[in-house]
Amino acid sequence: MVNMKASMFLTFAGLVLLFVVCYASESEEKEFPKGMLSSIFAVDNDFKQEERDCAGYMRECKEELCCSGYVCSSRWKWCVLPAPWRR
């Protein structure tokens, strides 16, 4: 009975270890393309867009900084399209 408990514990510990190793290697694989793409498409300060005076659709807003045609959502703090239920 003790051997069965020990073997079940070792099997479970092995599965947990396998899961951790697979998760770690997968997360490293996900970071590699992101790092490569960010270095390829790195934006220089000369090419950055100028900041707008107002925030566009789905941009973060504070008080009344949304562009015309949009309203600041009180719940999400994003600029959204005005609708009758958002008055």
From Swiss-Prot:
Keywords noted in UniProt: Disulfide bond, Ion channel impairing toxin, Knottin, Secreted, Signal, Toxin
Q: Where is the signal peptide?
A: 1-24
Instruction: Report the SS bond pairs.
Output: 54-67, 61-72, 66-79
**Any GO MF annotation of the entry:** ion channel inhibitor activity
What superkingdom does the record give?
Eukaryota
**Organ and tissue specificity:** Expressed by the venom gland.
Q: Which PROSITE patterns match?
A: HWTX_1 (PS60021)
Q: Which residues form the propeptide?
A: 25-52
| Keyword Disulfide bond assigned | yes
Q: Cite a GO CC annotation.
A: extracellular region
Instruction: Indicate where this protein resides in the cell.
Output: Secreted
Q: Which Pfam families match?
A: Toxin_12 (PF07740)
* Keyword field contains RNA-binding: no
* Protein role: Ion channel inhibitor.
Q: Which family does it belong to?
A: Belongs to the neurotoxin 10 (Hwtx-1) family. 51 (Hntx-8) subfamily. Hntx-8 sub-subfamily.
What is recorded about the domains?
A: The presence of a 'disulfide through disulfide knot' structurally defines this protein as a knottin.
Report the protein name in the record. U3-theraphotoxin-Hhn1e
Species for this entry: Cyriopagopus hainanus
